[in-house]
Amino acid sequence: MGIPKSSIYFCILLFCIISFYLQSSKDGPKELKVKYVFLKKATAKQRGESSLTDSDYFPKQPNMNATLFMLCRNRDIKDALVSIQSVEDRFNHRYHYPWTFMNDAPFTKEFITATSKMVSGDATYVQLNNEEWGIPINIDLNRMLKSIRDMTDDKVIYGFSLSYRIMCRFNSGFFYRNKALSHYDYYWRVEPGVEYSCDIPYDPFRKLSDENKAYGFVISMTDYYETLPSLWNVTRDFIHQNPQYLAQNNSLDFIVNDHQGLSGDYNLCHFWSNFEIANLNFFRSPAYTDYFAHLDKNYGFFYERWGDAPVHSLAASLFLNKSQIHYFEDFGYYHLPWYHCPTDVQSHATARCLCDPTGTIDYLPFSCAIKWLENINS
């Protein structure tokens, strides 16, 4: 009597399993393990979770005296939650730094409930007063309104908006004075709707402190001349009146081309301030305080449309030594419509970053990233 076919099939299957096991015992499991770890990281990324475990990070040290800061309105709740989730996942779930939220109106119960559930640290909610969120009392209202009309007709970006001008003035000279931030040494500005595409395997606040840096950025680009035609002249007047504030090893070569110094024209390069990590004592310094007062009495936030980004950038470039400014090149960051993505192989080979380095803003003609690197190396 012959052997049943089912037994033959079973023996063949058993032989295949044993052969596979013997082969994999030599070199298979190591390869399979690598594939599994990679797939596990990719799946975590798809879920929006961090890819790194605690052992992948530098040893954790005590937190710095710092806060994450967001200026927003109640209607920004969805975008605010996107930003909070991104920062918490990529960084803060390990550190639990507090958040400070500011608004020119009272925060709604819905906003407070939703955001406080998502943050991993304490949350503080602040309503701004009329001095912080307003226009100077001595301003020429007719001139301001004419400027708004003219910029609206000329289609200057945000030229139509009074609230945008008020926001830029607040971010230039008032946020760091607010009582809610008065006891902090460092802050990290987070705007609604931004996303971080790389895990952050260290504490950037501590990095600034350990390396004696006062200001950190991730994207730099040129600004719109139509928004700030007189800002550089007003700034130069301030430096000529207060030469003691000009840092010896400043970054004039970043903001002025061809090593022309203060005699040259502003090249419009600035740090995009929707992301910045900074020592608040820089903004509280006599140099910055006097500089903002000088700008404010010229009313350029309203007669023109000065932004807080060029104001911060000019101040940092002039009042700080270049070694005190840090380029967070290893951060992955998106703010509509641009993003920065690290270009080193390791960040992508380890799945630390989930972004396309070929599309980073640094390669575009209006980026000032190369200009900054030239300034550092000069």
UniProtKB/Swiss-Prot annotation:
It is an enzyme of class 2 (transferase). One of its GO terms (cellular component) is Golgi membrane. One of its GO terms (biological process) is protein N-linked glycosylation. The active site is at 276 (nucleophile). Its main location: endoplasmic reticulum. Residues 25-378 are lumenal. Residues 1-6 are cytoplasmic. This is O-glycoside alpha-1,2-mannosyltransferase homolog 3.
